[in-house]
């Protein structure tokens, strides 16, 4: 599963094609991934301009000129491909966006654990997928005091604690394992110790 650094890289690639561009065409290959894809996607996005993409944990957020946000999570196997012109869509291409530049951004997810959502930007802090995310590892809120306070009463393993997105947003199995190895901490150790 892509983790925070990989999702940041994907976000930057999306920005290179989408930022400031008008959407002229939409392709929705299936009606659901992990959850249903909004049925309004096709109708709502045509003619809309994408603003600068953002990232929160493992989520990519694309603000739109209509004061809505397109939210994307890559899941286990999700990826984006960029084309210079309309491609022939493949079996696992679930959502594709065509721009006025004739370029296309195609979201493919063979395992279908990813998600695509569309919501009003005023709900960004209360969206059900975002509202309970903890601070990111490089944010100002992520301090030694934060970790001490959050782990004080946790009886779960430290690795389970690190993987819980409510505690720290963006960390996955690879970075949790690597951090614990480098720190010389057993992943099975209780978080509070």
Where are these regions (language model features)?
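Phosphate/anion-contacting hairpin/loop surfaces
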Residues: 70-169, 175-176, 180-182
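Basic, nucleic-acid-binding surfaces and adjacent catalytic neighborhoods in DNA/RNA-processing proteins
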Residues: 22-41, 54, 59, 65, ...
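A cross-family signal for N-terminal binding/gating loops and helix N-caps
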Residues: 1-114
